[in-house]
Amino acid sequence: MTKVSFYKLAGDQTLALTLVCQLVQKSLATNQQVLCLVPDNRAAQQLDEMLWAFNGASFVPHAQGVDHVPVAISFDEKPGEHHQVLINLQAQIPTWFSRFERVIEIIYKQPDYEQAKRDNFRFYKERGYQLDFHDLSERFKP
């Protein structure tokens, strides 16, 4: 069964994308492929640029779209061939989330978005998914 982790931040979407970069790097270190599901093209471009500059000592192999690359960035409704780690920055849960070994939901400061993530937490909990919650609002600040 899919393991679901929630990470709560005190900042905005840009801070969330910084956390995504760290989580991507951590996943790659354990040879896991990642699909980063972002809300729109602007966020996809921003994450793409951040991954290029995130760590000067190592390359993060990534691309926009759902091609079979170690790290894919998409705002599309299709997961492609990915099935290991899904990092979801969209407000809603994709219908195909359960094909992934792990889903990471990131919560950042935006009222409607925060409420959607609360609803997502309830959805997973009611269906018996293993949930982890990490409140990084004091440790991971803008």
Predicted region positions:
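ASCE RecA-like P-loop NTPase motor cores
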Residues: 1-5, 27-29, 43, 81, ...
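Short hydrophobic beta-strand segments
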Residues: 5-8, 33-39, 86-88, 105
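Trafficking entry modules
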Residues: 107-113, 117
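Short, well-structured hydrophobic secondary-structure segments
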Residues: 20-66
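Charged phosphate-binding loop/patch that engages nucleotide di/tri-phosphates or the phosphate backbone
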Residues: 121-142
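Short amphipathic alpha-helical segment that frequently serves as the phosphate-/nucleotide-binding helix
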Residues: 17-22, 118
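Glycine-rich phosphate-binding "P-loop"
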Residues: 1-16
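Mid-chain, well-packed structural core segment of small domains
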Residues: 65-102
